[in-house]
Amino acid sequence: MSTEETVDEVPCCGSHDEAQCTIQHDLAPQPLIVEEEVNNGEKKAKIAVVGCSHGEMDAIYETMALIEEKKGYKFDLLICCGDYQAVRNHGDLPHMSIPPKYRSLQTFYKYYSGEKKAPVLTLFIGGNHEASGFLCELPNGGWVAPNIFYMGFANCIQFAGLRIAGLSGIYSHGDVEFSHYERPAFAERDVKSAYHVRNVDMFRLRQLKAANNDKLSNPIDIMLSHDWPGGIPDFGDSAWLFKKKDLFEADHKSGKLGNPALMKLIYDCRPRYYLAAHLHIKFAALVPHKGSGSERPQPTRFLSLDKPIPGRQFMQALEINVASDAKMELSYDPEWLAILKNTDLLTTADKTKIVLPDRIGSVPCVYDRKDFRPTAEEMEEITKLGDLTIKTDTFKHTAPPLKEDTSEAKNVPPSAYYRNPQSAEFCQWLGIKDLNYLLVEKSSDYVGIPFYMMPDSGETEFKSNQDEVDFGEDDFIIDRGHGSEEPEAKKSRLEEEKKKKKKKIENLKTL
């Protein structure tokens, strides 16, 4: 396939009339964005990429509209590389690791409530400034609003046949070995550890690498992380970078700049594109890969983008060839589904360090394999699941949507933790542990009734018998309509329910 390497640069001042652009840009060498010539049987997927979103969805979509008007086409997908800030209402703000005086509702709540709808399919990963209580309802990802999809702690999905892998959060040495155990109500430290990446997620992503005898392919088309891969400045103009950000050089030399495990992920999975954010500067790099003889896989084109404010380079346009019959929609990646099934034994809601199969060392071996890449037989099992298209109609409000941002709306307690129907449906369909359920079962404290189940929500027919609802009888603190129950009978019933819940939690801890 012949290619022409070009730069598709997005003006960063918000004005797309060059005559009006008064900002002088001091730029790093630009990334080589591959604009492939369209051959027979191919078309282009037009993708917009932004760095940190910071809840500025109105501004981001408005900028995209200006670009579309200038270029004369419509974007098929928007990718956001973290700090998305999916804040549903003021109750989500205490779940963000941001000093209270800097917390702001921003504009996502309008898309959650239905006041607005995202004009383009939007895909995002989490960063270190997120509404963590909401996102931990969706460990494996899901819709946070119509047309806006969160990738979960780690994921690989497909868009128009392109394989997109993502890792949410940032690196912290003290938390990387732990399980995902955090949920509201967050302890003071847990509101930070909730967004720290875990070894178990990176281990799962490494299973996406090609077969051992495959030295030439690029198994992943696009890989996303909020953090930079540790060592990435060495593959770009580091002198320019350290001149612009003088504190970066010392961190880079000491190994503290970025996630030290992500470069291995690049070498294992050889993504064609690697997109990141977090450090609020646009920076490009090119990572070559070893091949076989004179042949090599395509290099990984790394690009990190800035935050969405005037004068900063926060958006980039990509055009990537896809099959002519490719549908511009999301679908589950069959290999990733098999990896989730293979590694299901690593899922727990207990606060514990997870010993990975490839890092067993001297501890007794509890795994019967170290390589969890799916076998042909395991992939065959996935085909039995049928259509892998991600349904677009499964979103439901768990926290109450904010219809109007009034002073009264600000006076609310922190959001509860909710059982999310998307997590329940996905895990039941795939046959894996439901971390959202396990986190709910850890404690009945701060577990709320999802808004869509409320009788006055207008989103569902209220059922007085909650056993008929998908989640069963033990998931929520609810009034089951026992009417004018005698005090002694009520006391006896509550004691029995308390015993049942305690026993159920103890049973889960043994899994």
Swiss-Prot record:
It holds the Pfam family Metallophos. It comes from the Eukaryota. Its cofactor is Fe(2+); Zn(2+); Mn(2+). Residues 477-498 have a biased composition (Basic and acidic residues). Its EC number is 3.1.4.-. SUPFAM superfamilies: Metallo-dependent phosphatases (SSF56300). A divalent metal cation 1 binds at C52, H54, H280. This is Lariat debranching enzyme. The lineage of its organism: Eukaryota, Metazoa, Ecdysozoa, Nematoda, Chromadorea.
